[in-house]
Amino acid sequence: MQQDMQNGGPGNTISNLSSALRQVNLGNSNTTTDQSNISIDFNQQQLLEEANQGSINAYNAQQQQQEHLQQQAQQQQLHMQQLQQAQQQQAQQQAHQQQQQVHQVQHQHVQQDHMPIGQSQQQAMYQGPNPIDSSRITKFFQNQPMEGYTLFSHRSAPNGFKVAIVLSELNMHYNTIFLDFNLGEHRAPEFVAINPNARVPALIDHNMENLSIWESGAIILHVVNKHYKETGNPLLWSDSLADQAQINAWLFFQTSGHAPMIGQALHFRYFHSQKVKSAVDRYTDEVRRVYGVVEMALAERREALIMDLDSENAAAYSAGTTPLSQSRFFDYPVWLVGDKITVADLSFVPWNNVVDRIGINIKVEFPEVYKWTKHMMRRPAVIKALRGE
């Protein structure tokens, strides 16, 4: 109403009529003109009321039309919201159905004793309820070798290659059977009988009445202790109980912390049915923490070695006036336990070889780990084992 008064609505009509009345009313004297003014005033008042009523009616009609349009707009908006909700519910139902279909496939989870490496090999790691073709495994167990070792592994299993590296370093006679997960060979009854976890690696020691061992750490300890007992040479091992304890500590650290964390980081980065960034970040950060532990240990070994072998510059190194990186022994190999390579070191190799696939550059982030790994990767036995020979 206030807007109408400003734009020439009913209020403006009243103002114009009042001006006209003032012009007709000549004064306060009682003349005949005053009587005519009364008539004019009465007529003008009637016109004023009629004009005002017409404006009010027009205004009310306009208001009703606006309210009707607003109601139509609100109804249309409500209809659109209901349509969008229906579409969202339909999309959610479709996504839920797809997720159920995914979960109906029984994937074979990659655990600490089995982690795929190549993208083409990743699909082979997940097995649905396919029939088991155990013919090859059955044939092997019906005619086992009389001596040596049989290693059950997979082409994409770092822990299987970890055992192969130790067997190769000890120059032990062994044969590797790479299981075909697409055929379900890891679920063959004969294999489950020697490894109830139905995972790789598993080892049969044919020289000990076909003794079967499973879990990579247990296999390595069996092999290295047997070699030491038979030869008297603590190769990859130690004749010191104190050093043996330290070797065991690092070996258990690798099997319980290093390998599983990389395995989970790979799983959530590449294999999980949904992208869960928090899981990827959590396991990748944990891998970095683990490498930080190894990096610190190797750095301490490096400093001790330089101080021992580069004695003429030891004072400058201790004072900090000369950085350790200037020592000629800065790239000299150092090991986790003692002054020689052991199974504690070699157990890390296959997993260090795949860690770049979770976005960790050990050369940049962990230089001592990188140098340590590089020395081990150049060993002939390691090269042979990683080739699957």
UniProtKB/Swiss-Prot annotation:
Alphabetized UniProt keyword annotations: Nitrate assimilation
GST C-terminal domain location: 240-389
InterPro entries noted in UniProt: Glutathione-S-Trfase_C-like (IPR010987), Glutathione-S-Trfase_C_sf (IPR036282), Glutathione_S-Trfase (IPR040079), Glutathione_S-Trfase_N (IPR004045), GST_C (IPR004046), Thioredoxin-like_sf (IPR036249), Ure2 (IPR017298)
Gene Ontology molecular functions: transcription corepressor activity
A biological process term (GO) from this entry: nitrate assimilation
The protein's role, per its UniProt record: Plays an important role in the cellular response to the nitrogen source. URE2 gene plays a major part in the repression of GLN1 and GDH2 genes by glutamine, and is required for the inactivation of glutamine synthetase. URE2 gene product may catalytically inactivate GLN3 in response to an increase in the intracellular concentration of glutamine.
Subunit and partners: Homodimer.
Protein name, entry field: Protein URE2
Organism from which the protein derives: Kluyveromyces lactis (strain ATCC 8585 / CBS 2359 / DSM 70799 / NBRC 1267 / NRRL Y-1140 / WM37)
